[in-house]
Amino acid sequence: FVHFSFMDRTMTTVSIAFVNSLFRVATVAVLFPFIRFLEKMVCAIFKEVVDEEDKDIVEISVLDDRFIAHPTVAIEQAKTVLCSMAHMAQKNLIRSMELLDTFSQEKYDKIQRREDKVDRYEDKLGTYLVKITQQELTSGQNKEVSKLLHTISDFERISDHAVNISQAAAELFNEKLRFSDCAVEDVIMKEIVGNVIDAFEQNKVEYAYKTEPLEELVDIYCDEMKMNHVKRVQKGECTLHQGFIFNDLLTDFERIADHCSNVAVAIIELELNVFDTHEYLINLKKDNGTNFDKYFEEYKEMFPLSQY
């Protein structure tokens, strides 16, 4: 034990502060050369899983109840989180489609984790938006909150169907089966989901108008692919079990397109102050200034079934 002369003295506040500062400076001086080593040691002990999913965790924290008294801020925060949720659903879909081509257990597990996160976002957003509706809102704010409330479940359901696709991919992998027929649906699914997210995120009604023609094309192609697959089963080229899996996949594709259509219709209806969805869809397909036929033919040429 080292004895210093000042230890026999009565310590004042000044001397305590001085010794404390001296100790800290000495500690830094001694440990400074070992900073890199200490950093590596801490990282080795507390391993951090670096994943892009972690970026999303921060975003849900912006739904602070203190903002609810200020609807403009609260609505903007809610939209930010919902856009983040939509992108998570989109990434889940992209990953699940990739699994149909090349299965990866790591990617499969990531899809399941992301789906859990999407569910948490949906619950938190729904509760938060209901609280916002209890405030005095302007007409514009009411419209924006309505759009968010209308679209939450559709984005969540897109992620649900992505999980279904991943599970079908796992089943195909385990049974050493593979489908080549899904190539066209792969590109169309990415197109329709990306299109509707852009429409929602950027408030682009013109993007929303392109969604319904794409949804129509998805339905037509799925029907054709089902018929073609039935013929292969009848010829003995595919098993009945393969047929069930394939039909389930096509159903998921159709449902995803339906949910994209729901989001697009919500955007357009709220923009035009039209709230009869059935009547709107009828008028849309009559091409009353919406360029439905034009977009449909463009997409049909862009994604020809015979090329896949």
Language-model-derived ranges and their functions:
Residues 2-19, 23-308:
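Cytosolic, long alpha-helical scaffolding segments
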